[in-house]
């Protein structure tokens, strides 16, 4: 079989990686349903998985616990497989308020959402790649278990065009309207088309850098070509092209009509039940809402909140699982669950939270009972749909270990030869003063420190205390949004400050080679934040530095501490032994600071000649006050655009330049 995946990397597998790759591939070829890759922090788990994918040549879905880690994985996979289809599938909502009803105050909260168009395009691109290609890697969040349009309807709605095809122009326009494309002869953007004589330009919904030109001669397709929608420059001609629907929820007309009849039947039955129970207000509500939705579906082919009728639109029975991204994944697909100790419990918890909200809406007449089938997968449904699975974690959970049995592949030895941090236990009584002296030692060597506390109050007090003693310190907490969190991490790595204080610093899987010390305060207080798994994860934050060290402050050694210290020592001994046998000298990591969060953006390729914020203050010439003001306005616009496009690193860089220019502006004023 020819290789469809081409792995590009300057590195070759090292340490435990070759053994892990061979074991995982062998297990998958032998038909094992569940395997666990127990890889320590910094051991190159992503590179191992990339090698497994390249060796097996199977379409793969990688599940991550949140958007930040999904973006990090997407960025890494893009670098490993530049010639293959690496796609990104996460929730496309920048902001989402689901519809809800609070009976105690008789408050109905209307659904409100802000859709990120670029992520919507990436989602459509992901499903298109899964339907068209074998060399696909989709990096997804738990958004993958939520309802999506039915793949059968989606496939039936596609518009196939080819050179020499006999088709009337009006028929093409009608089909585009069925696919929910809109005609716009002025603003040509994603999901629109324009008509000029016998030429139809279509901007595919899943594309970010090309559009299709259809040239007709009478009723024959004379030429199909792809062109740049911005400049109009023709890239090349194509013999055929498939136009995919603008949304995953597009449905053939006959199925919509059939669904409408079933919705009317359900409405009639529901009205009888409500009237029999003297629920007159609820009966009036559900009748009014449903009839309005039916009218919209009849006229436009869709309505606001059409996903609540997904049971009828997908032709599934009551209680059956909704169609999801897993329905698009081929039967021979592979599933990789990253940070499985977090992701698996997340998958299990989604259904119940969604269900309780919808039951209230149904009970009070805001939705028909069939809306309950617009839901995420139950955990047992997820298990039934999941193909062969590899769980990846430094601290696998009970579920993964039980499912994998003896099929646990350890990746303890790092290719760089780096050892797990040295762990010390020190008394609580002097923890703050002891920490202060350790911070000063690290700051003098230009190294960074992570400090984790148990409570928000303690984190705030500690930050204030360290600031009073002249230390450069910042505080990371749950109220900080994703953009600012990435900025703080970047500033720590750049040396803008030396100490980062937080409560749950293991959450983001932070990769920071500059961190040489992790301090865990009140380590002897048993609980979620001081469990064996949490301690191992937190200790691992210092595992990417040659001088890595973890200090646990506690007056007694709890079971969790003993297990975490024991496991760290076991790994450290194994790593030292391997280095000794193979003559390896540990090397520090030199990770680029722009790597924390970088999603491929639609403007990257095309704007190379456009405005680019420069890297240093010296690059700015001595501008007049008016010119400075103009430049500040331009950079502000650029910064907000980067943030909107999820280019958090670029937004932070532009912010830094803005601060420099503002200081210059004030000095000149």
Swiss-Prot record:
Q: Which GO terms describe its cellular component?
A: cytoplasm; excinuclease repair complex
Q: Name one GO molecular function term.
A: ATP hydrolysis activity
Where is the short sequence motif Beta-hairpin located?
A: 92-115
SMART domains per the record? DEXDc, HELICc
Q: Classify the source by domain of life.
A: Bacteria
Give the UniProt record's GO annotations in the biological process aspect.
Answer: nucleotide-excision repair; SOS response
Which UniProt keywords are present, listed alphabetically? Answer: ATP-binding, Cytoplasm, DNA damage, DNA excision, DNA repair, Excision nuclease, Helicase, Hydrolase, Nucleotide-binding, SOS response
Q: Which residues form the Helicase C-terminal domain?
A: 431-593
Which residues does the annotation say bind ATP? 39-46
The family database entries (InterPro entries) matched by this protein are listed as: Helicase/UvrB_N, Helicase_ATP-bd, Helicase_C-like, P-loop_NTPase, UVR_dom, UVR_dom_sf, UvrB, UvrB_inter
The protein's location, in the record's own words, is: Cytoplasm
Q: Which residues form the UVR domain?
A: 629-664
Per the record's keyword annotation, is Membrane included, yes or no?
A: no
Chain coiled-coil ranges:
none
Q: Which residues form the Helicase ATP-binding domain?
A: 26-183
- Entry similarity comment: Belongs to the UvrB family.
Q: What is known of its domains?
A: The beta-hairpin motif is involved in DNA binding.
Function of the protein = The UvrABC repair system catalyzes the recognition and processing of DNA lesions. A damage recognition complex composed of 2 UvrA and 2 UvrB subunits scans DNA for abnormalities. Upon binding of the UvrA(2)B(2) complex to a putative damaged site, the DNA wraps around one UvrB monomer. DNA wrap is dependent on ATP binding by UvrB and probably causes local melting of the DNA helix, facilitating insertion of UvrB beta-hairpin between the DNA strands. Then UvrB probes one DNA strand for the presence of a lesion.
- Oligomeric and partner information: Forms a heterotetramer with UvrA during the search for lesions. Interacts with UvrC in an incision complex.
Protein name per the record: UvrABC system protein B
Q: What organism, scientifically named, is this protein from?
A: Proteus mirabilis (strain HI4320)
